[in-house]
């Protein structure tokens, strides 16, 4: 089968690499460097199994800047382009996605078009009605950013927002990306599938907020947070997954789903979800105070290869520290490619903040501030 994938991010690449063992896959997107890298076999995907996977499997995959060329002869179209959030942070902006759907619908009449990234609840049904596109489906992805290929090749479950033969066909194609069978497949309505995506992300956001608050209590009252978490997670109903505290949630999809649900169901009486974002704000404020208690002259923000958005926790902490008069430096380079710059950064800072502790920081562990309890 010839499959066109609109998108060049980790979701698109995870799908493409998994499907390209059995299908002809063409990716498209407006990023020349990524297109060139993909065509050179240098896939911009940070997945630990990537090198071994490429060595073991023959893949039929290429990329192009020309969307028309990518869609030519396509028997299935996947759209894996993440949505931007509105300037006021209230909800998703769908205009760009709508134009991509319309373009694919015009170029590939009758061909199944599958939306993979999070969309507003009710969006797929609205687009189906507007375009008369009965073959437009929603099939949410649940890939981890650093393990997208691994999750594609070993899915625990697949959800497709169509309960008919078309939904079963799309599920079979997505299942073909797996290296082994066994994934549970659920066919459901489009809006229900959209809701599953957002509620699952909201649960993860609430879980992150819970363990961050546990850590905040421990910080404030002199408790050993790791010991408390280890004890709490012995209960099998809680489990040992996703329990490592962090500085906070940024503008990524987890808190966005929570905000979207708050907006969509704002008139429904609720207490848990509306407080998740507020919990994140409180977490940032506490961490800023704890850092300032150490009275460092120069504070470093260690964010290798990172591009912090306006709502990223490292950015928010940096802003909070600067507002209190602290001198803040940031390292966003490639630690392995520029060791001299990293060494200079370490030497210049009295305290270094890091979301996660990496080997690059082991030599200055005494002056690293992190809430990574499982490093």
Summary of predicted features, one role per range:
Residues 1-375:
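Structural/interface elements that position substrates and couple domains in central-metabolism enzymes
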